[in-house]
Amino acid sequence: MPASLSPGSGPSADPTRRGGVGCLVASLVVGGLFAVATYAGVQWFRDGMDLGGEVCRATANGSTVSFSPEQMDNAATIVGIGMGRGLPARAGTIAIATAIQESKLRNIDYGDRDSLGLFQQRPSQGWGTPEQILDPHYSTNAFFDALVRIDGYEDMVITEVAQEVQRSAFPDAYADHETEGRVLDSTLAGHTQASMVCRLDAPVTHTEVEELVADLETHLRVSGSPSEDGRSFVVEAPSEQVAWSVGQYLVAKADRHAITGVQVGELAWTRSDDGDALQWGSADSDGTPTRVVATLTPTEP
């Protein structure tokens, strides 16, 4: 018969051990809370970025993503080209997720071996010359050209279809950015309204109207016209969705084109370096749902 343990005679009665276990539990709890707090702080800094400074945000389907003005400018180029080509939303999502994984949406002039640009395409693999690949318009179209040659790409999981195009050493990583791709495509394609905002410093240059016209016609394939005084630019869109696509595209490119405000219908985004720029508000004047008006920075008289 095994020896019986009287109360207080077993290992649990050892006060030293009890204290050690208690300290261990306390350490684990404190460590866990610290880890959670650290993670939450990093997420708050990454996603909220409310410490000031320039930032752009897009929100759709309950998710919000934050990027620098440069990154959001490139995202707008990608989605805009996809729309201009008449491609489905899935194509934009795939392209955005791929560019986030490959370059973090930056048009970088370096990479693994001879990889370059938004999609880290390689001249040695026939993607084009270095100069061509470093042109976001060219590199995005090259990506879409390869994508549409894949039968059934719209129904494929993103890891498979992106790998077919990119031949990456880490194909599973593309899936990490699918939610970001969906949010940016939904916003920039106009499916989600009043959901693209940018907090920006005051413009340091004036709007080059010819560049703005070329940007819209080349990417979104829409046209507009400046006012006589050069202080605004108007686009009459064929539908409300296209109007929101154009409007939020212009917000995403406000830094590039020195745009100080965008109005779509009865809502408006106004450029500023504070929290007011992180939301759309009521416009000063009523507008038709399909009219987009961008306020420009004119040249000095």
Which residues does each predicted region cover?
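N-terminal export signals and maturation junctions of secreted/periplasmic proteins
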Residues: 2-80, 193-194
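Non-catalytic terminal regions of proteins
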Residues: 3, 206-301
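Peptidoglycan-targeting cell-wall enzymes and recognition modules
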Residues: 55-66, 104-157, 164-169
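Solvent-exposed, acidic/flexible segments
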Residues: 67-71, 75, 87-91, 111, ...
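Extracytoplasmic/secreted envelope proteins and their assembly/folding machinery
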Residues: 72-79, 92-95, 118, 137-144, ...
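Short, functionally critical alpha-helical segments immediately adjacent to catalytic or ligand/cofactor-binding
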Residues: 79, 89-104, 165-166
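N-terminal carbohydrate-binding/catalytic regions of secreted carbohydrate-active enzymes
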Residues: 82-84, 109
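Catalytic and binding regions of secreted/periplasmic enzymes and modules that target cell-wall glycans
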Residues: 140-208, 227-234, 263-269, 292-301
